Amino acid sequence: MKNLKQLVLPCYKLEMAMSVEAWYFLHGSTDGICNLTYLLSLLSKMTVSEVQNTKRGLGYAVHPGQADGSMLVLAKEWGIGRKAVSRLLEDFSERGLIRVDSNPVTSIIDMVCVKSWMIAGRLIENPAYRQTVKAYEGAVSYTHLT
């Protein structure tokens, strides 16, 4: 797993919304590492503009608010098994943090808990955001990066 201090997010401000259950889950751990660290790793892969990628000769688009995250690549980066990655992504999905769409080429991860981000003074709404909790049911986190 990358050192948390080395993670670089694609923008300097994020607005996220999540349930209290998701918030508590992020403060738990998987394989001795805080679950928030894994989510931050996914956030560092999130695109803020459309990106065209190619794997095995097949092209595909990664849209704003999505991350390209094959299970094998994440397993290697995070230092845990592929099944552990799959379970962790499933846990994130069940708590309304992400949505995973897998195909034979890769897994596209929608960062559905990210409401918006700010780049160059512009607020950009996340097209992948899905409101899963009402304001009184969850927590909103504003993450400022410098």
Where are the regions a protein language model picked out?
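Short, amphipathic alpha-helical interaction segments positioned at domain boundaries
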Residues: 117-138
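Residue-level marker of positions within ordered structural domains that often coincide
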Residues: 43, 47, 79, 116
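Short, cationic-aromatic polyanion-contact patches
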Residues: 104-124
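Winged helix-turn-helix DNA-binding recognition segment
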Residues: 48-110
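Conserved small/polar residues in nucleotide/adenosyl-binding loops
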Residues: 143-146
